[in-house]
Amino acid sequence: MLLRIQLPTFKTGSYLVQSNYLHHQPTRPLVYFDHWAMMLFGGDSGLRRRFADSLRRTGGTLCLSTTHTGELCRVDDARHARDFDALLAEVMPRAFWIDTRRLLSERDRWTEYPPGDIHAAAEVMRSRRGDFGFYESVWTYGRRPRPGKSTLAEVFDTATLSTAQAVDLARQGEDFRRKAKTFQPKNGRAPAWVLLGELLRSTVLNDAQAFTANDSADMQHALSLLHCDYVLLDGGWTARAEGARKRLLEAGIRLGNVYSKRANGIDRFLADMETPASAAAK
C-alpha cells in the first residue's frame, strides 16, 4: 500500500531536501539484491521487466540500502550506476530503503519489517526529470574529491577494511575461537548480531579462510536475510546462510530464501517470485 508521510525540510550530504511526502511503505514479499544482482537485472531489460512485473503482481517491494551506494562509489565505471537507476526506474514506486545500522542496535525491538532510511529515500525524491538518476548522482558525488574531506568511496573503503581487520584480529585470540566453537544462537541479543555470529563462525574457526573488505560489504548485504523474503547474495555467502539456517531457526530467527548465480539460482528465484504460494516466504 502507498503511504504519505509528512516530512520536514532537512539537509543531507550537500543537498537541501525540501520534500513534503515520502510515498511508499514496504509490503511483502520483500526482495533484496547484492551489487552483482542489481547489475544483472538493471542491465538486462528482459530480466528487469520480468522482475518488476512479478513485484507488481505480488504487491512486493525491492529493498535497498546504503551498502549499495557505498559499493557503487568504489567502481570506476558509470555503467554500474546507470544499471542501478534502470532497475530502480522499472520498479518504482515499489522500493524501500533499509537502515542496516539500526538492525545492529541492541536497543531496537525486533519487528517484522526492517527500519527505513528516510534520508536515502528523500534523496531519491530530489531527482527531477532531466537530472542524473539517483544512483548516478550519488556515484558522481561520492567519487568527487573534496578539500579536507574523504570521498564517500574512501569512507566506505576505510569502514569495510577496518571491519575485515577487526574480524582477522579477533579470530587470532584462542578465547574468542573457543567461544565461537561453542556459541549457541539464542534470543536476548539483537537478531542481527546473532545472525552475524553464525555467518562468521566458519571464518573464525578456519585460519585458511580469508576475510576481505569485499566480504565486509557482502556481510552487510546478508543482514537483509532477517527481514526479506527473497535475497540474492554472492555464492559463498549464500552457502553460509544455508549452513546457519537450522541453528538460527531453533533460536526463533527465520531467514528469507537465499539465491546466488550458482545452481540455476536466478531462474529459481524468478520462478519462486512468480508462484503465488511462494510469495509469503517469511
Regions found by a protein language model. Give the residues of each.
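Acidic, metal-associated active-site segment
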Residues: 72, 216-228
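Accessory, usually C-terminal, subdomains that scaffold auxiliary metal cofactors
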Residues: 227, 235-261
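Pol beta-like nucleotidyltransferase catalytic core
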Residues: 263, 267, 281-282
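Acidic, proline/glycine-rich low-complexity IDRs
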Residues: 256, 271, 279-281
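Short, well-structured N-terminal submotif of metal-dependent ribonuclease cores
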Residues: 2-66, 70-214, 239-251, 267-277
